[in-house]
From Swiss-Prot:
PANTHER family: PHOSPHO-N-ACETYLMURAMOYL-PENTAPEPTIDE-TRANSFERASE, PHOSPHO-N-ACETYLMURAMOYL-PENTAPEPTIDE-TRANSFERASE HOMOLOG. It is found in: Cell membrane. Its EC number is 2.7.8.13. Belongs to the glycosyltransferase 4 family. MraY subfamily. Pathway: Cell wall biogenesis; peptidoglycan biosynthesis. PROSITE patterns: MRAY_1, MRAY_2. It is a multi-pass membrane protein. It holds the Pfam family MraY_sig1. The chain crosses the membrane at residues 3-23, 51-71, 79-99, 115-135, 138-158, 169-189, 195-215, 221-243, 306-326. It catalyses: UDP-N-acetyl-alpha-D-muramoyl-L-alanyl-gamma-D-glutamyl-L-lysyl-D-alanyl-D-alanine + di-trans,octa-cis-undecaprenyl phosphate = Mur2Ac(oyl-L-Ala-gamma-D-Glu-L-Lys-D-Ala-D-Ala)-di-trans,octa-cis-undecaprenyl diphosphate + UMP. This is Phospho-N-acetylmuramoyl-pentapeptide-transferase. GO terms for biological process: cell division; cell wall organization; peptidoglycan biosynthetic process; regulation of cell shape. Keywords: Cell cycle, Cell division, Cell membrane, Cell shape, Cell wall biogenesis/degradation, Magnesium, Membrane, Metal-binding, Peptidoglycan synthesis, Transferase, Transmembrane, Transmembrane helix.
Amino acid sequence: MFISISAGIVTFLLTLVGIPAFIQFYRKAQITGQQMHEDVKQHQAKAGTPTMGGLVFLIASVLVAFFFALFSNQLSNNVGMILFILVLYGLIGFLDDFLKVFRKINEGLNPKQKLALQLLGGVIFYLFYERGGDILSVFGYPVHLGFFYIFFALFWLVGFSNAVNLTDGVDGLASISVVISLSAYGVIAYVQGQMDILLVILAMIGGLLGFFIFNHKPAKVFMGDVGSLALGGMLAAISMALHQEWTLLIIGIVYVFETTSVMMQVSYFKLTGGKRIFRMTPVHHHFELGGLSGKGNPWSEWKVDFFFWGVGLLASLLTLAILYLM
């Protein structure tokens, strides 16, 4: 436990030092910053804010977790595969950000390219991680999927990777939401005695807390796709490594809600010839524009943050209660 906590502290400090250096480099190199949604007027002041800051906490957490695990004899298959997903999905996000920022390709990777790379990473993860007989845990009950587990694994990794990416649209929202989710999985890992996975979790929590100091409103830096895609993939990988896949539907309710809002909006728009359910999606923008109803007073980014963090915290506590108190 001491090793895991130490890893978190070291990653926190490295990120705390690394982010200002990253911002300074970004400014000196005169790199074009984040582009903003035109429909959310309060976001226009953020135009030009440095992005790709997730690169800092990602590198710090991966290196710290790897070396701490190596020197404490905890470099297990599970640790290796979680770090692999972090690195690969981080690289996919980096390429996406690179095309947007440096090549001025607004779309970045097109959806087919991004999906292909995410699926490739998922296949490699499936082939090497300890699956325990391709058993899917559904509310604590084992479901033997056999070879078909690979389709679930791909859906889980790609789905939650993109879901966290959608959540990263308000200052600090994604970073602390993931901290809350990881904290819940940290408890599960500790109870299961999987201290190797706990080490990786605490290393990332440390990095995200260090990043949040510069990412809360008004944000001095954004994590970019390099951070959000990696974090979503990490959450999916951890839920599978702990054989508690179903828990991510509740622990990750914020990401599920954000993704579902987009799917509902697009489907309803097509079916009705242009009508909308929400003022704007992902749904955090709906709250920004007009509160819960979409027709009331606009919510500040802090209010949106605390609402979603509260939902995420309650969902995480509910999951732990279901697992250990019922």
